[in-house]
Amino acid sequence: MAAGSWTSLLLAFTLLCLPQLREAGAFPTIPLSRLLDNAMLRAHRLHQLAFDTYQEFEEAYIPKEQKYSFLQNPQTSLCFSESIPTPASKKETQQKSNLELLRMSLLLIQSWFEPVQFLRSVFANSLLYGVSDSDVYEYLKDLEEGIQTLMGRLEDGSPRTGEIFMQTYRKFDVNSQNNDALLKNYGLLYCFRKDMDKVETFLRIVQCRSVEGSCGF
């Protein structure tokens, strides 16, 4: 038989047997601990990037008196994520189930898919990481996939997919009462840092509950 025929036959056999091989456990399931490690690393990377970029931008462009007036004004410091129900205290956070914490993390991540484009110039001018808005978007997508996998594992063992949270910070940007571009970017960076901190915190709690010896991560 010709080499091409053998290749086609082998491919057909593999495709036919793939479901049976999966059911038989021929493809080992990735341990939950590894999935959580991967998600935590991705969340930490995003949080660190958000924190450092916010701090760099603040030191370069925002005078102290402007910073304080911004943070004390509810109209300018309000983050869109306030519309996503999240715990208001450590006690409330601990009362949430793992699935609830993952769900909230997923919504927070998805709410940033579009807004990172507004920060294109900020990332382009940053001297810290050399990333673009498309890089940050890919980081968010990677974490989204990791969280969906974790949710599926905790629910029924299969990867979970769902509709993307369609509301984003676009509304925050359009309805902003502040016409200064610097302060708009500052406000978005403030919220990005705040939201990524929440995501990392929620995932850390899930990991601590699920993996023995991981609470000191």
Swiss-Prot record:
GO cellular component assignments: extracellular space
SUPFAM superfamilies per the UniProt record, alphabetical: 4-helical cytokines
Family: Belongs to the somatotropin/prolactin family.
Lineage top rank: taxon: Eukaryota
Principal location listed in the UniProt entry: secreted
Modified residues (Phosphoserine): S132
GO molecular function, one term: metal ion binding
Name of the protein in its database record: Somatotropin
Coiled coil: none
GO BP terms, alphabetized: animal organ development; growth hormone receptor signaling pathway; positive regulation of growth; positive regulation of receptor signaling pathway via JAK-STAT; response to nutrient levels
Disulfide bond positions: C79-C191, C208-C215
Gene source species: Callithrix jacchus
UniProt-listed InterPro entries: 4_helix_cytokine-like_core (IPR009079), Somatotropin (IPR034975), Somatotropin/Prolactin (IPR001400), Somatotropin_CS (IPR018116)
Gene3D superfamilies: 1.20.1250.10
PANTHER family: SOMATOTROPIN, SOMATOTROPIN,PROLACTIN
PROSITE patterns hit by this protein: SOMATOTROPIN_1, SOMATOTROPIN_2
The protein's role, per its UniProt record: Plays an important role in growth control. Its major role in stimulating body growth is to stimulate the liver and other tissues to secrete IGF1. It stimulates both the differentiation and proliferation of myoblasts. It also stimulates amino acid uptake and protein synthesis in muscle and other tissues.
